[in-house]
Swiss-Prot record:
GO terms (BP aspect): mRNA processing; RNA splicing; tRNA processing
GO CC annotations on file: chloroplast
Main location: plastid
Protein name: Maturase K
InterPro entries given in the database record: Domain_X (IPR024937), Maturase_MatK (IPR002866), Maturase_MatK_N (IPR024942)
Function: Usually encoded in the trnK tRNA gene intron. Probably assists in splicing its own and other chloroplast group II introns.
Gene: matK
Lineage, broadest ranks: Eukaryota, Viridiplantae, Streptophyta, Embryophyta, Tracheophyta
Record Pfam families: Intron_maturas2, MatK_N
Length: 512
């Protein structure tokens, strides 16, 4: 592991020919499957025609696999049946999948906190990992969005030409053989489809090697955001403060004054269209939200920037309708499974001066997060917990499990959902979800025991509902014992947790 240290230094991973030699190291493939460096890798085994290496990953084996992939006479395509549109002969799909696993491990080396912690001989997870909670975004939105005017709902487009992806990686990977190998891996999964789109070919690519797919997609998104960040920093002349000549303290204020006079006299009319110190941007997966306190014209300018960026930098046309510009408080947007809005609340206060009395109107804005019941029911229906009308149904696939396992699965699903949606300002939808999952569990158990739901619930009694008791209710009961808040007041307050590192699968359907 010591030889990785040179690659983890700043700029060390940009050296030429560091990737391709690492593909021939046995421990790379052990790391790919979290195996010990001296333990046989059991996740994949070699085909019979190349056995005899004790099922270990060796440099000789990898060389033979890459050689077979490069041989053009092994590439046989089917032009009549798309389901057979893959490599055939000598198990080439296995070879390329194995190589792609090693490739994924190599490119993740500079970004792997697990590897960095192991190099430092520390077993604990770095502390900054605790700051990666999904819920940590919402306190930021609560603090910033109440003062903003416009919001843009942006869907980052998927179609990216394969060669563009290679060029993006080429900015920091200067290893030509590795880039050629990456092209071969692309063409195996796509076979003539030169774009990453949410279709069957991409589904096969992401399913067979999700680590490599996530890395490539994140590289593309980082490239988009880096250009956006450059435009954002260049949108205001105040960024000139960071230039080298202005670092001299003796001339700093004089030059700042000169810059201010020059911009006000000569360039003020043009720069005022781009300067926006109140621009805020958040993103999760392929959806991003950009909010501003500027004008509608400024938001349209940014929309034009994004469309031109995707068209001229990544060479594909994106519909302008993928960017929706709306104005608070008349707009609600979906983000991370929540329906968020900034409504205006009116409050009246009666004031009296001498013999005259009058009402004073006060306008306040508050960031609210709610659960939309219709998309949530659709997500539960897709998972076969209810129908599209929201009526609970049994889960036949779980009928063969034991009673305790069935109850535990349903209870765990609800506890995860209630934990994730603890930030909702209105908890009524959680009660509806609780009803659907609880009755679906009862129908599944009744189906297993060939009984009616009513008879089965009477036999179980109140113990059946203990698995669906909210963990948040236990926490809130402890808080109520020490505070003066009522249960009704506290139930409306959002609770954000800093231990949620991934979005729930049922919630994730809402953002698709």
């Amino acid at each position: 592991m010591e030889e990785f240290k040179g690659y983890l230094q700043k700029g060390g991973f940009k050296q030429q020919h560091f990737l391709y030699p690492l593909l021939f190291q046995e421990y790379i493939y052990a790391l790919a499957h979290d195996q010990g460096l001296n333990v046989n890798a059991s996740t994949f085994t070699e085909p019979p025609e190349i056995s005899g290496y004790h099922n270990k990953y060796s440099s000789l084996l990898v060389k033979r696999l890459i050689k077979r992939i490069y041989q053009q006479n092994r590439f046989i395509y089917s032009v009549t049946n798309s389901k057979q549109n893959r490599f055939v002969g000598h198990n080439n799909h296995f070879y390329s999948q194995m190589i792609s696993e090693g490739f994924s491990s190599v490119v993740e080396i500079p970004f792997s906190p697990r590897l960095v912690s192991s190099l430092k001989k520390k077993k604990e997870i770095p502390k900054y990992q605790n700051l990666r909670s999904i819920h940590s975004l919402f306190p930021f939105l609560e603090d910033k969005f109440t003062h903003l005017t416009y919001v843009s709902d942006i869907l980052i487009p998927y179609p990216v030409h394969l060669e563009i992806l290679v060029q993006i990686l080429q900015c920091w990977i200067q290893d030509v053989p590795t880039l050629h190998l990456l092209r071969l891996l692309f063409h195996e999964y796509h076979n003539g489809n030169n774009s990453i789109t949410p279709n069957k070919s991409t589904y096969g690519f992401s399913k067979d090697n999700p680590r490599l797919y996530r890395f490539l997609y994140n590289s593309y998104v980082v490239e988009c955001e880096s250009i956006f960040l450059f435009l954002r920093k260049s949108s205001s002349y105040l960024r000139s403060r960071s230039f080298g000549p202005l670092l001299e303290r003796t001339q700093f204020y004089g030059k700042m004054k000169h810059i201010g006079v020059t911009c006000c006299n000569d360039f003020h009319k043009s720069l005022c269209l781009f300067k926006d110190p109140f621009m805020h941007y958040v993103r999760y997966q392929g959806k991003s939200i950009m909010a501003s306190k500027g004008t509608d014209f400024l938001m349209k300018k940014w929309k034009s920037y994004f469309v031109n960026l995707w068209q001229y930098r990544f060479h594909f046309w994106s519909e302008p309708s993928r960017i929706h510009i709306n104005q608070f408080p008349h707009f609600s947007f979906y983000f991370l499974g929540y329906l968020s809005s900034v409504p205006i609340n009116l409050s009246y206060a009666k004031s009296q001066m001498l013999e005259n009395s009058f009402l004073i109107e006060t306008f306040t804005q508050k960031f609210e997060t709610m659960i939309s019941i219709i998309p949530m029911i659709g997500s539960l229906a897709k998972a076969k917990f209810c129908n599209l009308s929201g009526n609970p149904i049994s889960k036949p696939a779980w009928a063969d499990l034991s009673d305790s396992d069935i109850i535990d699965r349903f209870g765990r699903i609800y506890r995860n959902l209630s934990h994730y949606y603890s930030g909702s300002s209105k908890k009524q939808t959680l009660y509806r979800i609780k009803y659907i999952l609880r009755l679906s569990c009862a129908r599944t158990l009744a189906r297993k025991h060939k009984s009616t739901v009513r008879a089965f619930l009477q036999r179980l009694g109140s113990e059946f509902f203990e698995e669906f008791f909210m963990e948040e209710e236990k926490v809130l009961s402890l808080i109520l014992a020490r505070t003066s808040y009522s249960s009704h007041q506290l139930s409306r307050e959002p609770v954000w947790y800093l231990d949620i590192v991934r979005i729930n699968d049922l919630v994730n359907h809402l953002d698709l």
